[in-house]
Amino acid sequence: MPTELSDITIQSVLPCDYSLFKNNLRVSRLPESRFVFSPKEEINCQSLLQGPELKTALDNLNFIHKQKFEHQFRHGYWKLHPHPHHQHDSIIPASWIHDTPHMKLVFHRLQNLPDGDLLLENDPKNNVGYFISGGIAGIVSRTCTAPLDRLKVMLISDTGSKPSPKYPFATLLHTTKVLWNRNGIRSFFVGNGINVLKVMPESSIKFGTYEAMKRVLGISSSSENHSPLYSYLAGGMAGSVAQMFIYPVDTLKFRIQCSDLSRGQHGKSIILSNAKELYKSVGIRGYYRGVLVGILGMFPYSATDLGTFEGLKRTWIGILASRDNVDPQDVKLPNGLVMAFGALSGSTGATIVFPLNVIRTRLQTQGTSAHPATYDGFIDCFYKTTKNEGFRGLYKGLSPNLLKVAPSVAISYLVYENCKKWLGLE
């Protein structure tokens, strides 16, 4: 497929020349019942839809997208040839670009013209779709990796032993054995219920906000010349917004995971008892212990994770598009690559900010049976951790964290990217 169309080819698809086409495209919302054609223009519109260029493209769409495309084409054509008594602005939505090769290239060509921009509708349903996709991705990925998350929290909270430089996995194996002896397989899923309640809105807000910030910063899947910094900035802001919303649930989750199951509490009872205990001891501010540390850690993590994934994805799509001589938007990344890019970006971000996460987690879990120590704040926690355990203590739990993060983020991106496809999102 050529990278751009000639003027003759575009003219064969569009019912007018460039300037007239662009001058008549404005943002508006108008139901089909408001389209009023003269008999002659109604025939002309139908002829264009049945013409060889558009008919071939429409035949490649499913029924729903075909109906939507025909509706929007009639809307656009109506603006070019309106009834004298019905002068309105028209709308050309982003759905026109959906997997229709000729029209996709037409729009890309028009958007790059120096004398004006082509305005595309921002469909609100698409915005909701990103949040839904993010929520589903979070639930699936976090449930699959719940045992590793439990191990990570237990290791971070344990201040009684120093990591062994000779046998870095010895502590991990010991903790696994301790958890198994406590309550069998159930011990590895303690806190998973609240984990899901936490991760669903967190992942939903993170991905939804990320897509929104990309649009604000002018980043789209078809833009090739934007600075990579924008992707990292959008990712960092998205993660910070999500962190602010779910931080109280995050604190409660960590405290539950550090609870002693020997008291016979399970399910709702353990959630309610921990919530009441925390509120009685320090009030509502107890739920926000370490929130600034959390945001300081989340911004670089989310920026690295989302920004790196976006960069790897865009780079590889460009390579495949050049190799196969196709438009980049026609390239579909294999699921294996999506998971590999997700695992790499997530692991990189997690390693960079892990010391901050250790401090944050200890501030959140202080005073529990698994972590009885208490701190006066971030600096005090940092000082006591490095004094008692050395700087290696700041990376305590990194091994199970990476074992959890790599598959978790890989699964998350896999589900998210496929959900976007299923919902017809870019």
Swiss-Prot record:
Solcar repeats lie at residues 125-216, 226-315, 334-422. It is found in: Mitochondrion inner membrane. It comes from Schizosaccharomyces pombe (strain 972 / ATCC 24843) (Fission yeast). InterPro entries: Mit_carrier, Mitochondrial_sb/sol_carrier, Mt_carrier_dom_sf. Pfam families: Mito_carr (PF00153). Belongs to the mitochondrial carrier (TC 2.A.29) family. GO terms for molecular function: ATP transmembrane transporter activity; ATP:phosphate antiporter activity. Keywords: Membrane, Mitochondrion, Mitochondrion inner membrane, Repeat, Transmembrane, Transmembrane helix, Transport. It is a multi-pass membrane protein. This is Uncharacterized mitochondrial carrier C12D12.05c.
